[in-house]
């Protein structure tokens, strides 16, 4: 708690009493290390746009005094990333008010053109091709990634990642659950995205 004493604002998540981990593995610190790394990677992906300061001051997230840096699943600054034109799709919310869903495709570089840092930023080489597809953001927070929503993957899409930004006013249209971990793409959007 002292960590926040000199800060203007902040939140601390404190984990204590790891009796289940201790009983299951016997080595609490080794298991916590695995969970810590997985948690840091997850947060670095989910909140990457906030951590990188997109459109605002960068957010700071620390895991055991380690400051997280945002990943970049689109490798937007890589010289060989093909950044395609952003399109905006108007859609009416449940009250009939027009909202905008923005869509921007990226074609990522071939693996041979990636540095070790590029591989880390894109989410790891083991996920490089497996996690191609749509990346759905709700208010710049990543909620779904690496899915084609049932669309067949082919040679033309093997390096494609598509950023889709939706406002929170479309939660009900997208079927976003309370945990912000599930969404169902509306037919009007699916038809436009899969063209």
What would you call each of these model-derived segments?
Residues 44, 48-95:
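Accessory nucleic acid-recognition modules appended to NTPase machines
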Residues 1-4, 8-10, 15-19, 70-77, ...:
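Bulky hydrophobic/aromatic packing residues
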């Amino acid at each position: 708690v002292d960590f926040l004493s000199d800060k203007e604002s902040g939140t601390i998540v404190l984990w204590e009493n790891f009796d289940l981990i201790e009983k299951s593995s016997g080595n609490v610190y080794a298991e916590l290390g695995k969970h810590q790394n997985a948690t840091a990677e997850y947060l670095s992906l989910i909140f990457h746009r906030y951590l990188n300061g997109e459109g605002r001051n960068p957010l700071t997230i620390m895991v055991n005094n380690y400051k997280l840096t945002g990943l970049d699943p689109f490798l937007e600054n890589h010289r060989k990333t093909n950044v395609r034109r952003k399109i905006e799709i108007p859609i009416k919310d449940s009250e009939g008010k027009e909202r905008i869903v923005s869509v921007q495709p990226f074609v990522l570089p071939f693996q041979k053109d990636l540095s070790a840092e590029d591989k880390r930023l894109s989410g790891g080489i083991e996920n490089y091709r497996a996690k191609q597809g749509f990346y759905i953001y709700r208010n710049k927070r990543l909620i779904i990634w690496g899915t084609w929503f049932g669309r067949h993957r082919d040679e033309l899409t093997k390096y494609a990642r598509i950023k889709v930004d939706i406002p929170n006013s479309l939660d009900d249209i997208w079927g976003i659950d309370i945990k912000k971990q599930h969404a169902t793409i509306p037919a009007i959007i699916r038809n436009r995205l899969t063209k």
